[in-house]
Amino acid sequence: MEEFDSEDFSTSEEDEDYVPSGGEYSEDDVNELVKEDEVDGEEQTQKTKGKKRKAQSIPARKRKQGLSLEEEEEDANEESGGSSSEEEDAAAEQEKGIGAEDARKKKEDELWASFLNDVGPKSKVPPSTQVKREEETEETGSSKLLVKAEELEKPKETEKVKITKVFDFAGEEVRVTKEVDATSKEAKSFFKQNEKEKPQTNVPAALPSLPAGSGLKRSSGMSNLLGKIGAKKQKMSTLEKSKLDWESFKEEEGIGEELAIHNRGKEGYIERKAFLDRVDHRQFEIERDLRLSKMKP
C-alpha cells in the first residue's frame, strides 16, 4: 500500500509538470494563451510606470490593470474629511464634558457651603476683627515688656544732700562742701552730729537765768563748751588739703570728665596700676588655695 501511494504521488507531480505537445492544442486554446500573455505584459508595464511616477513625486493618475484610480482618491478624501469632522465632534464633546464637570463641582461646593452655614456655629466676630484684636494685644504686651525693661535698666534716682564739714589746717578753718546721697553713711553721720550740736548751742542762752552766786561755774561751763566746739574741728593733713585743692580746681576749670576719660584709656597710669593690683590679688588667691589644698589630709 505504501509503495502504491508513493507511486500515485509521483504520478500526480508528473501530471502537473506535464506539457502536451503542440499538435494537441486547438486554435481557440492558442488564442486564449496569447491574450493572457498580452494582459500580463501590460500589467507589468503599468506597474513599472507607477513606480517611476511615485519616485518623481508627481501627483498623477495611478493606473492599475489599465484602470484609473480617481474614484479611490475621492474615497480617500471623503474618508479624511469624515475623520476630521469626527475629531472635531470628539473635541466638542470633550469640552462639553469638562464644562459639565465644572458645573457639577460648583454645585457641590455651593451645597457644602450651605451645609456648613446651616450646621456650623456662626462666628459673631469676623476674622478680620479677630486678627486686629490679636495684633493689638501683642502690641500692648510688647510695649509693657519694653516699659518694664526700661524701668529695670534705669536705676532709681536717689536724692542728693549737700554736706559741709569744717577742718582745721595749720590754724586755719577750712570748709568742705560735698554732694552725697541721702542714704550714704556720710550723710547719716552728718545729720547725727547736727542733732547733737543743737542742744549744746542752746545751753549758753539759758546760762544768764542762773543765780548770781554761780559766776565761777558759769565761766567754767562756757570754757568747756567752747573747748568742745573747738575740739570737734578735725585736723586736715597736707595730702588731704592738696587733694581738696585739686578737686576744687577741676570743678572750676571743668576738666573732670576729660581727666576721667584719659585715665580710663590704655595709657592711663591709674588704669595700669589698678590692673596690676588685680593681677597681684588674683595670684595671691591662687597661691592661698594651693596651700590650703595641700594642708588638708
Swiss-Prot record:
Residue(s) carrying N6-methyllysine: 217
Residue ranges of the region described as Disordered: 1-154, 190-221
Subcellular location: Chromosome, Centromere, Kinetochore
Biased composition (Acidic residues): 1-18, 25-43, 69-78
UniProt keyword annotations, A-Z: Centromere, Chromosome, Developmental protein, Isopeptide bond, Kinetochore, Methylation, Phosphoprotein, Ubl conjugation
Organism name: Camelus dromedarius (Dromedary)
Keyword Hydrolase: no
One Gene Ontology cellular component annotation held by this UniProt entry: kinetochore
The protein's name in its UniProt record: Craniofacial development protein 1
Domain BCNT-C: 216-297
Comp. bias intervals (Basic residues): 48-65
Region (Hydrophilic), start-end ranges: 176-215
Lineage: Eukaryota, Metazoa, Chordata, Craniata, Vertebrata
Function: May play a role during embryogenesis.
Keyword presence, Phosphoprotein: yes
PANTHER family reported for this sequence: CRANIOFACIAL DEVELOPMENT PROTEIN 1
Basic and acidic residues: bias regions: 93-110, 190-199
Location (main, coarse): nucleus
Matches recorded under InterPro entries: BCNT-C, Swc5/CFDP1/2
Cross-link named Glycyl lysine isopeptide (Lys-Gly) (interchain with G-Cter in SUMO2), sites: 148
Modified residues (Phosphoserine): 80, 83-84, 114, 214, 248
